[in-house]
Amino acid sequence: MLNTENYEFWFVTGSQSLYGEETLRSVEKDAKEIVEKLNASHQLPYPIVFKLVATTADNITKVMKEANYNDHVAGVITWMHTFSPAKNWIRGTKLLQKPLLHLATQFLNKIPYDTIDFDYMNLNQSAHGDREYAFINARLRKNNKIISGYWGDEDVQKAMAKWMDVAVAYNESFKIKVVTFADKMRNVAVTDGDKVEAQIKFGWTVDYWGVGDLVAEVNAVSEADIDAKYADLQKEYDFVEGQNTPEKFEHNVKYQIREYFGLKKFMDDRGYTAFTTNFEDLVGLEQLPGLAAQLLMAEGYGFAGEGDWKTAALDRLLKIMAHNEKTVFMEDYTLDLRQGHEAILGSHMLEVDPSIASDKPRVEVHPLDIGDKDDPARLVFTGMQGDAVDVTMADYGDEFKLMSYDVRGNKPEADTPHLPVAKQLWTPKQGLREGAVGWLTVGGGHHTVLSFAVDSEQLQDLSHLFDLTYVNIK
């Protein structure tokens, strides 16, 4: 997968000097134990670093500034061991530009009825401190996440892990650079949008480059690199020549490998992590990138067809959140409207990420009527079963909106011998009819990101961080 920062999260424990040094030492000891055991749980995707017991406005402000300035810090986790006067948190919290998690927990998960006294109550008053602290976050309109429960429980740790993935995706969003080779497909509305506003709101840089600049990189790829990659792919996938001569099959597959290396070098040299192509502008290329795009998506690059830079950036963003697992560019195509069989068949002309393949992908070469170029090689496979979210983004003039619904992924009821593309079947969980009406009413697009590794709660959390309107169609 494309590399991201080696992120960590800082743990800040709230208290106050009123309780004395002995109590504060106990607070620090307990906080360090929580951090140590959370890191040892193997439930969290990123490490937590204990920073301090925060007792004054000055030390709170200082640590929040430090979190901002350290690029490897993805967010701050706060816990109120005791009561912590919330006015102390105002300045630092206002300055904090990283995601914030309020962990509403307690060091012990029970009340020691036989031994409890007021010293114990003073030390273990998270329920008291949580309410004071949560008020100031709400008063500041902080858009922070709150997770409540015992820190040692697996469900709480899994909730923290999901939030960590959201926080990292948020940080990485401001590094996403999309290259569009040619403009978007002519006369299409939903794939258009305000690139300046996208950079202001999400941090996305979107640059146009002419196809000729890509062609130069493609033509410069060495035969040795192509031959080596061809041999590697023969080990990983089934090669099916079909109606092609052996010479034509090998040539067309190797040309996609040439495009793969050309695209990869072009992006890596310039810092791009997502890209779009357009079948209307392929001057100088023999084929529309198919297998090439699929191989790059499998490595974590974002992609969308027809110049759809929003979906390409969203694809990259959700791949980061999902650790590049089971998260793919997708398009709604054909419906099964029979009662009891309701489903959407999703695919694209060529470019569906093999991370959702339920069978061994096959490398095949077939004609493509669109684009007026040579027959492109592509990976052909059937998608998977399971719970997923289907996500899209559109620009409505006055705002961007993120939209999704929960779906159930299924396999087709029968083979499709005349459909030589990757395909995925799914049904909205609220029903095909209800889901379609909800999607169409809000104006959801035909290009989406389908993920079996991200859920709607994470999309809601991400939208809060961006102050982005999120429509969860139910």
UniProtKB/Swiss-Prot annotation:
EC number in record: 5.3.1.4
GO molecular function annotation: L-arabinose isomerase activity; manganese ion binding
Cellular component terms (Gene Ontology): cytosol
Record keyword Metal-binding present: yes
Pfam family for this entry, one: AraA_central
UniProt keyword annotations, A-Z: Arabinose catabolism, Carbohydrate metabolism, Isomerase, Manganese, Metal-binding
Cofactor note: Binds 1 Mn(2+) ion per subunit.
Pathway connected to this protein: Carbohydrate degradation; L-arabinose degradation via L-ribulose; D-xylulose 5-phosphate from L-arabinose (bacterial route): step 1/3
Gene3D superfamilies noted in UniProt: 3.40.50.10940
SS bonds (residue pairs): none
BP term (GO), one: L-arabinose catabolic process to xylulose 5-phosphate
InterPro entries hit by this protein: Ara_Isoase_C, AraA_central, AraA_N, AraA_N_sf, Fuc/Ara_isomerase_C, Fucose_isomerase_N/cen_sf, Lara_isomerase
Catalytic activity: beta-L-arabinopyranose = L-ribulose
Positions bound to Mn(2+): E306, E331, H348, H447
Essential cofactor(s): Mn(2+)
Family: Belongs to the arabinose isomerase family.
Reported function: Catalyzes the conversion of L-arabinose to L-ribulose.
Protein name stated in the entry: L-arabinose isomerase
